[in-house]
Amino acid sequence: DKVAKEAADDVTTCGIGHTRWATHGGVSDTNSHPHTAGKVTLIHNGIIENYKELQEELAAKGKEPISQTDTEIAAMVIDDCYTGDPEAAIRKAISKLVGAYGFCIIFSDIPETIYAVRNGSPLVAAHTDRGSIIASDMVALVSHTKHYFVLKEGHIAKLTKDEIIVKDENGEVYGPYIHHISWDMASAKKGGYDYFMMKEIHEQPEALRNTIRPRMVNGLPDFSADGVGDELFTDVNRIVITACGTAMHSGLMGKNMIERLCRIPVTVDIASEFRYQNPIIDEHTLLITVSQSGETADTLAALRLAKERGAKTLSVVNVKGSSIARESDYVLYTHAGPEIAVASTKAYSVQVAVMYLIAFRFALVNGKISEKDAAGFMTTMIDTVDKVEDALTYDQQTE
């Protein structure tokens, strides 16, 4: 905000910025984004795994970085490939990169244009009557527009104030699918609370009801409105749940309930380690991925590995049109709305709720519980939501 206020309107109509954890090197201005190398300036969300090897290749050409970051190496690689054609340089450069990245790039000789490309890390973009905008999360867009698109992996977006042009891996112009943001700017503000976390704690009852009630038909768990048929739960002899961070803890809750009701073995793996374990997966395995954003790079990689090995795949995500949602066989959306706070609250609660719903439906389909049992579980869930709401009325007394 400070930079935006200090920059006069006539200085530029194009800019990029990014706040990133100090994953490489210390916290310093030198290691901060954007990074510039020659004619290339970029910001980067993700991690370049082979940056050391690339740094050695650049050093052999007499090119040394100023910072300690993998991002500057990426900028140097793109600049090294640049001969006047931005898209050709980006294509050549990303063929050398290993890892996750979402790049927004400005070339100094084309200063009013942003080029964007991604692999693993999310990028969403929109064109409005005030220009073009791109970000890693749609929360950043909601104050500007209700419509956006998700940039596909390997596609290159060219953003100017007048338009956004997207090209696929073959250089052909691609018309992306436009998504609608169903919540408004008020959902992304504190709404009278001191902190986003406190606001989101109090939003749990509504989020839980929005997640549970559409899946309750005649008192029973039902996913037909989600397009998830009972065939997903048949011919399965093993369930694997994979996720990262808080989402993985919801998976542990799911494991407990699924094993208890369905009497089927369930393993929960942290997604960042899943690929390196050579997991035992086949066509009789159901892989459940859990991710609030639907863009968690390690979870997405785990999903792809499971699909390669023939597993059925089901994702539990909050963001429609996200990569994990698109690439899964089946999707169950949580309806938490935006979660701004770093500490997960309502997103975790609805993930647990969906895991329980999966357990109830799986057990019912396979004859492990009766309809009466299933209806009782659903009633208990709704009653629990009411109790959560009641408990939150005592927040002032417990502070």
Regions found by a protein language model. Give the residues of each.
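Active-site cores of enzymes that catalyze phosphoryl transfer or operate on phosphate-rich substrates
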Residues: 190, 200, 342
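Well-ordered alpha-helical segments embedded in enzymatic catalytic cores
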Residues: 89, 207, 228, 273, ...
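Accessory alpha-helical/coil subdomains and C-terminal extensions
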Residues: 383-399
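Glycine-rich phosphate-binding loops that contact phosphosugars or nucleotide phosphates
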Residues: 234-383
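Conserved short alpha-helical segments that host acidic/polar catalytic motifs at enzyme active sites
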Residues: 1-190, 194-195, 206-237, 371, ...
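Residue-identity detector for glutamine
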Residues: 55, 68, 204, 277, ...
